[in-house]
């Protein structure tokens, strides 16, 4: 069964993103939200790309925009807040990294 990983913190401040990558499986999904959006510019992002296929990598667009983060839509998919709620409700298992 796949897991939804909600990453709310920056790897520049905590080890939560590294811990997430240590346990992630190939069929899991990662969503960057809140300060987790900063992980797009962290070295660990390349590790995330090597473990998870693009269709399962998301960022909450409103949270990235609020932090003036440029989104390369070839490297990550965007979610609206409504789409995030739909994804959470449709997923049986999730963990929040915060």
Enumerate the language-model features and the residues they cover.
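Extended, well-folded catalytic/binding cores that form a central cleft or groove in large enzyme
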Residues: 19, 56-59, 87
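Short, conserved loop/helix-junction motifs that constitute active-site signature segments
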Residues: 22-26, 47-54
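Short, glycine-rich nucleotide/cofactor-binding loops
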Residues: 3-16, 34-40
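A general structural motif
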Residues: 2, 27, 54, 91-92
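Short internal beta-strands
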Residues: 29-34, 55-63
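N-terminal beta-loop-helix "entrance" segment that forms/cooperates
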Residues: 38-49
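C-terminal structural segments of small proteins and small subunits
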Residues: 67-98
């Amino acid at each position: 069964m796949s897991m939804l990983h909600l990453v709310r913190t920056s790897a520049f401040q905590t080890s939560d993103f590294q811990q997430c990558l240590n346990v992630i499986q190939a069929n899991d999904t990662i969503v960057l939200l809140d300060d987790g959006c900063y992980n797009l510019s962290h070295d660990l992002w390349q590790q995330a790309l090597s473990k998870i296929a693009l269709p399962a990598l998301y960022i909450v667009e409103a949270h990235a925009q609020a932090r003036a983060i440029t989104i390369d839509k070839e490297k990550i998919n965007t979610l609206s807040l409504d789409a995030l709620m739909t994804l959470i409700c449709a997923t049986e298992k999730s963990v929040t990294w915060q």
